[in-house]
């Protein structure tokens, strides 16, 4: 340094200090000859500091000395050996050693092993240590799952704690057409995974266990499932192997199981279009309780021409015994596509929940509820909610050939149907509730309810249901002596039907309330062979004037009750053409806007309620006043003068009165002067008919 600055404190601004600092920094940063430079103190002896170049050299030496030098020094008993550096290794009898640190090199070994051995460290695993430290070092470690019995303290225990994975059993796969795992037949590996999970539960006392598949494509024939085993797909696609036999199920859970689950994201792919048209299969086949199928794509299941088998997910009883029914099962968040038969079939089940799924482009129903056989299947409690259906033939079919109450307590709501023939199709069911926000675009029936006499249908409610298109909005049909017991239709919006918005046959306990209809062709509401039906607050609008009744009571219908009707665009409001005379109850006022004939009834029918109108007397002693409400034995008619001439007439000997015996049922009543002489013909009256 040019100046002695040892007396100046740190931070001094003295020019000499600044000069020395500049010189030191120049050496520290730019020298390629000096590894060290001396600082200026101060107020202590100067210390050596690393130059930048010196730090580089020191680092390079460290890297160089970190590896072992090969070939090793050979130790020969009885011969001295000098070890110059710590990186040198010594070989004796095939084993490697290094000098134990710390040590002062060079180290002189005597050649007497008993004296030299304490100075050395056994190093035969050093190369393995370095290989294990590499990025792929984990591939050198073997592992076989064991049962945990203590807290996790080792890598072995940590590995034992993770879900069982199918790749643990890849060694069992023998059918490998190519190195690509997507071409292998993984059935043995999946079966071993499931069986191992079952064994683990039996030995550990666990109630359920988790397995893991994905990601990747795995070709399989059929996996026989076990109770308690839950599998997370993790992006896996389980795909039917090209050699799969006819009639199998990709996942076969039919051994009277309990507590099983299949969770996405993942795919169950039957790959049906690559098989012979006669090839049949199921996706997930369950004879089980406590089942969950969630967040999966289930696609390409079934056969092209054979309609037995072919379901995406099916719940069944034991066949033929019928001694086991599915229970507490859920399918949610799944997407079904290109399913040849039913996307989901319930042939047996208590508390079955089908929630928030998508159903697309499949041959038959999104959900088919159909008891297996005559006495084997039992269905009690099915919820179908929040689903989206597009391109299936049916939305929900619930069909049984069993006796009363074989299928009951079915609730459907909040579903959307597009491009379907029928949204709902019920046969032989009881306690069914449909609607609750449903929207349906159909080509035939919004809801079809059927009874043929072999089974009965009871307690059907359709509420808050919007349907458009098709032939019928709601069609309750009976044949061969069939009948319905209690059907309630409320808060419906029906548009664009070609035959009838609502037709109901052979029902006791029919209620139609708060229904809004807009049509431009076909008939109106048709009630046939029903006992005491009630229609309230029905709004019927013909988009063009339709020459049909808005509401028709026909056949053996008895005691119909109507009220609050709002009808426009029809030539006839309410038509009663029953085969026998009956009493019609008018429950409240009705509005017939532009309807030429508000009421059309067969003579003899008695319409309870109140009818009113006006007329002008003829210049005669008597005249007939038309009114469909007239009943010759029961009607009470009041005449109300509405001008001075009528008041004068009523105050004198010519007072007009109604002669029931000369009137005609449902056609007209006879008005006659009291003295039998002619009225002036200028008298105007209002009338009120009371049918009590």
From Swiss-Prot:
List membrane-spanning regions: none
What are the PbH1 repeat spans here?
A: 326-348, 349-371, 379-400, 406-428, 457-478, 507-529, 557-578
Role description: Structural protein.
Could you tell me what this protein is called? Structural protein 2
Compartmental location: Virion
Alphabetical keyword list? Repeat, Virion
Q: Quick one: a GO biological-process term for this protein?
A: biological process involved in interaction with host
What are the annotated GO cellular component locations? virion component
- InterPro entries reported for this sequence: PbH1, Pectin_lyas_fold, Pectin_lyase_fold/virulence
Where does this chain mainly localize?
virion
């Amino acid at each position: 340094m040019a100046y002695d600055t040892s007396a100046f404190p740190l931070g001094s601004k003295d020019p000499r200090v600044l000069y020395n600092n500049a010189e030191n920094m120049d050496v520290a940063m730019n020298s390629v000859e000096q590894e060290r430079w001396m600082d200026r103190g101060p107020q202590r002896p100067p210390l050596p500091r690393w130059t930048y170049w010196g730090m580089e050299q020191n680092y390079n030496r460290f890297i160089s000395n970190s590896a072992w030098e090969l070939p090793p020094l050979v130790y020969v008993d009885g011969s001295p050996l000098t070890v110059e550096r710590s990186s040198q290794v010594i070989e004796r009898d095939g084993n490697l050693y290094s000098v134990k640190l710390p040590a002062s090199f060079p180290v002189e070994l005597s050649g007497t092993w008993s004296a030299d051995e304490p100075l050395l460290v056994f190093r035969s695993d050093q190369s393995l240590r370095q290989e294990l430290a590499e990025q792929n070092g984990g591939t050198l470690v073997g592992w076989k799952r064991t049962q945990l019995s203590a807290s996790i303290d080792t890598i072995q225990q940590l590995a034992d704690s993770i879900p069982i994975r199918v790749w643990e059993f890849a060694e069992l796969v023998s059918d490998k057409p190519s190195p690509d795992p997507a071409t292998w037949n993984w059935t043995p590996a999946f079966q071993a995974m499931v069986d191992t999970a079952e064994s683990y539960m039996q030995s550990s006392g666990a109630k359920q266990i988790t397995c893991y598949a994905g990601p990747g494509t795995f070709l399989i024939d059929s996996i026989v499932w076990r109770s308690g085993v839950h599998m997370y797909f993790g992006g896996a696609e389980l795909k039917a192997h090209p050699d799969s036999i006819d009639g199998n199920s990709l996942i076969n859970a039919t051994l009277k199981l309990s507590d099983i689950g299949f969770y996405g994201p993942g795919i169950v792919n039957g790959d049906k279009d690559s098989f012979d048209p006669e090839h049949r299969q199921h996706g997930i086949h369950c004879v089980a309780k406590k089942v969950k199928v969630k967040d999966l794509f289930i696609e390409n299941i079934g056969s092209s021409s054979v309609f037995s088998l072919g379901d995406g997910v099916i719940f069944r009883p034991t066949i033929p015994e019928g001694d086991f029914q599915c229970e507490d099962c859920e399918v949610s968040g799944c997407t079904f596509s290109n399913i040849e038969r039913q996307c989901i079939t319930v042939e047996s089940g208590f508390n079955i929940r089908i929630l928030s799924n998508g159903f697309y482009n499949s041959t038959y129903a999104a959900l088919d509820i159909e008891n297996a056989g005559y006495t084997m299947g039992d269905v009690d409690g099915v919820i179908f909610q929040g689903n989206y259906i597009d391109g299936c033939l049916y939305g929900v079919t619930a069909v049984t050939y069993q006796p009363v109450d074989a299928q009951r307590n079915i609730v459907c709501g909040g579903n959307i149907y597009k491009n379907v023939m029928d949204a709902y199709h019920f046969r032989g069911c009881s306690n069914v509730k449909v609607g609750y926000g449903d929207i349906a675009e159909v080509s035939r029936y919004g809801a079809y309810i059927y009874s043929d006499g072999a089974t009965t249908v009871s307690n059907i409610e359709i509420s808050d249901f919007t349907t458009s298109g098709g032939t019928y909005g709601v069609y309750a049909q009976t044949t061969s002596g069939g009948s319905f017991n209690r059907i309630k239709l409320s808060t419906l919006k029906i548009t664009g039907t070609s035959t009838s918005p609502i037709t109901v046959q052979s029902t006791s306990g029919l209620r139609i309330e708060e229904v809004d209809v807009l049509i431009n062709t076909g008939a109106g509401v048709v009630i046939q062979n029903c006992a005491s039906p009630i229609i309230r607050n029905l709004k019927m609008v013909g988009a063009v004037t339709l020459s049909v009744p808005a509401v028709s009571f026909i056949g053996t219908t008895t005691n119909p009750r109507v009220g609050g009707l709002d009808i426009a665009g029809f030539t006839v409001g309410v038509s009663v053409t029953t085969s026998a005379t009956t009493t019609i109850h008018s429950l409240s006022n009705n509005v017939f806007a532009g309807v030429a004939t508000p009421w059309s009834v067969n003579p003899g029918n008695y319409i309870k309620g109140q009818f009113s109108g006006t007329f002008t007397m003829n210049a005669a002693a008597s005249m007939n006043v038309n009114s469909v409400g007239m009943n010759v034995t029961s009607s009470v008619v009041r005449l109300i003068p509405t001008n001075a001439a009528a008041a004068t007439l009523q105050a004198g000997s010519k007072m007009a009165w109604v002669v029931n015996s000369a009137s005609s049922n449902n056609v007209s009543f006879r008005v006659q002067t009291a003295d039998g002489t002619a009225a002036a013909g200028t008298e105007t009256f209002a009338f009120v008919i009371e049918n009590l």
